Amino acid sequence: MNNYKLTIQYDGARFKGWQRLGNNDNTIQGKIESVISEMVGKETEIIGCSRTDAGVHALNQVANFQSDEKLVEHKVKKYLNQYLPNDISITNVEEVHNRFHARYNSKVKTYLYKIWNEEHTNPFMRKYSMHVNKKLNVKSMKEAAKHLVGSHDFTAFSNAKSKKKSMVREVYSLEVMEEAGFVQIRVSGNGFLHNMVRKIVGALIEVGLGQLAAEAIPQILEAKQRNQINCLAEASGLYLENVEF
């Protein structure tokens, strides 16, 4: 069996997320599987590294699929890009060891979140950022971010769909940056619970607006109560930026 690794970019604005939900659904996984299956002449499943939600984008999503026949990488890339919609792009195709698994072999995932932080709206970024029209206190947000770095039980930063055996995850870095009207948040970790990144961003927004004290973050982590964070950041501002194996 031959195993192929795909690197994928997509604009998630019109899709129902990564994960296939049915035979004819509007998901990124479904669209790619349909084209690959047509190419190889049999139904083929792809495995994605991150099951991004509806409206979430990817700069470097990674997936893999297996094929009985030997495929030529550059021909696979050309075929997929020819028949996929233009808001999904295959940037690289690479044959890998048959034990490679995009989800289970990932070691570090990095997400980027974009907040448009001006009083006026940005019509060109409305599907690609979250608009916060009150000035955020970035200094306070940076202080709050420090409390989230490290290994913690992130139950308070998940939702009811997160039914993992362990809610402990390690955040390697969490940066808050200002640039040309935007506040951007970059977070790297060994894995994330469902909605964890959007809840982290939501908490930092609450801190930036003065609705939550930076010093309250450790107590929120300790309490493990999901209702402590009221703001779930919009999907539109979230990007899967990078995956390391």
Swiss-Prot record:
Assigned EC number: 5.4.99.12
Keyword tags: Isomerase, tRNA processing
One Pfam family per UniProt: PseudoU_synth_1
Active-site residues (renumbered): D53 (nucleophile)
Single GO term (MF): tRNA pseudouridine(38-40) synthase activity
Keyword tRNA processing: yes
Alphabetized Gene3D superfamilies for the sequence: Pseudouridine synthase I, catalytic domain, C-terminal subdomain, Pseudouridine synthase I, catalytic domain, N-terminal subdomain
Chemical reaction(s) catalysed: uridine(38/39/40) in tRNA = pseudouridine(38/39/40) in tRNA
GO biological process: tRNA pseudouridine synthesis
Residues that span the membrane, as ranges: none
Known function: Formation of pseudouridine at positions 38, 39 and 40 in the anticodon stem and loop of transfer RNAs.
Protein family membership: Belongs to the tRNA pseudouridine synthase TruA family.
PANTHER family tied to this protein: PSEUDOURIDYLATE SYNTHASE, TRNA PSEUDOURIDINE SYNTHASE A 2
Name this protein carries in UniProt: tRNA pseudouridine synthase A 2
Protein's organism: Bacillus thuringiensis subsp. konkukian (strain 97-27)
